[in-house]
């Protein structure tokens, strides 16, 4: 659904907007609960904003990295896809150390500190060269993609891998 809009407005605008949403949402998490009449609404609005940004970042980074002129694309893409795991571990580690040093009542400051990551990436994506994603200027259309049987096999594999990832995540945290 969003692919046609991203192609129309460009990957740079899309990824910078996604980073802005993530930074604003995380910063809002520290500020909005005190500004709004209901702290819960402040938290919900913030979570929705940074979730939209984070989801877009996840979807947009793969094609941007894929378009980069690297010699070893497979290794680079594998590294990119491992960042979710490294990010989870890093966030847990940094949060734990932060809470041990500053206490749980300082959680708002942690949200502001975490917002620095997308804030720095706003500059990074605004200034870095982004290669065109398709050679001839026209990609595969959605209808054309739906007609390929391999597409549906990949969809099923992604559903199964997502289900197994969630199962492992739930099992490991239990």
What spans do the regions from the language model cover?
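Cytoplasmic helix-loop-helix junction between adjacent transmembrane helices
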Residues: 44-82
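Primarily marks hydrophobic transmembrane alpha-helices of the MFS/SLC 12-helix fold
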Residues: 12-15, 43
């Amino acid at each position: 659904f969003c692919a046609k809009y991203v192609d129309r407005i460009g990957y740079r605008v899309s990824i910078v907007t996604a980073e802005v949403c993530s930074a604003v949402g995380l910063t809002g998490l520290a500020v909005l609960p005190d500004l709004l009449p209901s702290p819960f609404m402040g938290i919900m609005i913030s979570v929705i904003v940074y979730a939209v940004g984070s989801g877009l970042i996840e979807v947009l980074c793969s094609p941007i990295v894929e378009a980069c002129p690297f010699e070893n694309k497979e290794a680079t893409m594998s590294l990119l896809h491992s960042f979710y795991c490294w990010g989870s571990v890093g966030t847990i580690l940094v949060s734990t150390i932060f809470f041990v040093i500053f206490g749980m009542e300082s959680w708002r400051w942690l949200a502001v500190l975490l917002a620095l990551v997308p804030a720095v990436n706003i500059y990074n994506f605004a200034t870095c060269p982004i290669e065109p994603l398709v050679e001839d200027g026209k990609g595969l259309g959605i209808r054309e993609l739906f007609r390929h049987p391999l597409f549906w096999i990949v969809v099923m594999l992604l559903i199964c891998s997502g289900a197994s990832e969630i199962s492992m995540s739930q099992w490991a945290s239990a």
